[in-house]
Amino acid sequence: MTTIVSDSGMIRYKIITAEWLIYSHRNPPFWAFEKGIYLEKFDSLFHVDASIKADTAYYYEPKKLWELRGNVHIQSQRGDKFDTELMFWDQDKEKIYSDKFIRIEQVDKVLTGYGFESNQQMTEYQIYNNTGIFTVEDNAVQADSTQTSK
């Protein structure tokens, strides 16, 4: 099933899923995507802002909160790749976050950590308890440790 979702007359998302369950009479009402989801988020010019893939997802309508679970893969507009097992996207607060292990792959580095918080565009973020692999240029002249200063 492929669905286009609009908000205020603007196309915002394309959702591809095998099953979309809507629990409108539950408290709180929510959507369930228990057989996986692929979602593309569009900007105002209809460019793909981000793509999201997860094994399971829930969308809590009143809170405008997405809960993504299992093999969560996100690619930002800049091309950065985010991988985790659990991610929340709070649309009202325009914030994306997780308290689980996260791996972020950029062109020139890989960052990992436990816990993550980002703006909605995934351009500014903080990683907690982090480590990373990245290139460091070694252009500095090394001081001779055998010489003493006078």
Predicted regions and their residues:
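Mature-chain termini and adjacent capping regions
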Residues: 1-150
